[in-house]
Amino acid sequence: MLEKSLATLFALLILATLINRFLLWRLPERKGGEVTLRIRTWWGIVICFSMVISGPRWMTLTFFALISFLALKEYCTLISVHFPRWLYWGIPLNYLLIGFNCFELFLLFIPLAGFLILATGQVLVGDPSGFLHTVSAIFWGWIMTVFALSHAAWLLMLPTTNIQGGALLVLFLLALTESNDIAQYLWGKSCGRRKVVPKVSPGKTLEGLMGGVITIMIASLIIGPLLTPLNTLQALLAGLLIGISGFCGDVVMSAIKRDIGVKDSGKLLPGHGGLLDRIDSLIFTAPVFFYFIRYCCY
């Protein structure tokens, strides 16, 4: 099933590439440079992800740890506070807890270490100016890029009935999360009228949100029972939760960027911006979907 699912992703990418080339041929005046760049980046993302998700579990965990590291590093370039380098060691420790299936320690490690060690460490520096801003900014970045994001990796550790079960759960989550972004964008562009958060993200509309959520619920209803142990009702609810939480992750990251005064979080992914621009929705959907499916099925 994993091989067929990945083959479907490649088929969709081929279709998108052909449609884009056809439109560029038929409408030469159309500016399709950004779309072409985005599709090329998607090719790189899907090829890399396919290799990792098809490999051994340690490889997938290492990949997620690398994503957390790059995301945290990118976040550090955005905020105007000094980020202690020793905090980066929390990333391999966090993913080691996942690899050894230490769920209780995982729940405590990042939140408790951030609450106690981070705050105490800043006090020992000796300068209390900007203490609250510094600690909260660092802690929020650590929670987002390491703790929340690593819940996607935890899906690999759930006691599934077959060896590919965890990988299929990750694929299901990522496919719906990214499709949700695309669906909400397309619905918003086609029939969006009422803005949801105009001061944060003017392009987000109520019609785009509702259309995207309904689309993802239908997609989840179709592929959920195939890739996951969810039944029909649970698959619908999973689609609803992913659709709404993905929107929340998107606008929260937009609020952070607006507060800092930047449009994109970086330039790591051509046509997409930074890594945080690509995984902002996943930061929220990963923990929501993990606890939902763990409660419902495990």
Curated annotation (Swiss-Prot):
Q: Where in the cell is it found?
A: Cell membrane
The GO cellular component terms are: plasma membrane
Q: Which UniProt keywords apply?
A: Cell membrane, Membrane, Transferase, Transmembrane, Transmembrane helix
Q: Is Transmembrane a UniProt keyword of this protein?
A: yes
Q: Which gene encodes it?
A: ynbB
Protein name (record): Uncharacterized protein YnbB
Tell me the PANTHER family matching this sequence. Answer: PHOSPHATIDATE CYTIDYLYLTRANSFERASE
GO biological process entries? peptidoglycan-based cell wall biogenesis
Tell me the membrane topology, using the record's own terms: Multi-pass membrane protein
What the entry lists under InterPro entries is as follows:
PC_trans
Membrane-spanning ranges: 5-25, 52-72, 105-125, 138-158, 163-183, 208-228, 236-256, 273-293
Primary location class:
membrane
Gene Ontology MF term list: transferase activity, transferring phosphorus-containing groups
Indicate the family of this protein.
Belongs to the CDS family.
Q: Which organism is it from?
A: Escherichia coli (strain K12)
